């Protein structure tokens, strides 16, 4: 076997459809576009969402809600991720970055209660969920809001 003699498996390749190349091809003359009409013209197609002049759906439906300009983007940390730290250690932004739990501080760090914590840890973060506070204190740890 040589590289120049390798052929694809039978039936694995298909000839592409060459349109507008004569009547004998079966796709000549109108080139699969039918007769006349907007879609038969060059560049002729309606834009997405166009409904023939009728008021389109995206304009019939009302606008809703808004995007708050002052929304904070917290780096989220779950309690189950903090199990990698030893008991009694102080966990702050620097420790979380070094361990790879978060990739950046952004607008702050928020600790969420997903999973369980079994070690007593001192956690320094900007925000804590109510259930995360309960779980940390129940495990004998302490919380410091920055």
UniProtKB/Swiss-Prot annotation:
Residues 30-39 have a biased composition (Basic residues). GO terms for cellular component: cytosolic large ribosomal subunit. Pfam families: Ribosomal_L27A. It comes from the Bacteria. InterPro entries: Ribosomal_uL15, Ribosomal_uL15/eL18, Ribosomal_uL15/eL18_sf, Ribosomal_uL15_bac-type, Ribosomal_uL15_CS. HAMAP family: Ribosomal_uL15 (MF_01341). Part of the 50S ribosomal subunit. This is Large ribosomal subunit protein uL15. It comes from Citrifermentans bemidjiense (strain ATCC BAA-1014 / DSM 16622 / JCM 12645 / Bem) (Geobacter bemidjiensis).
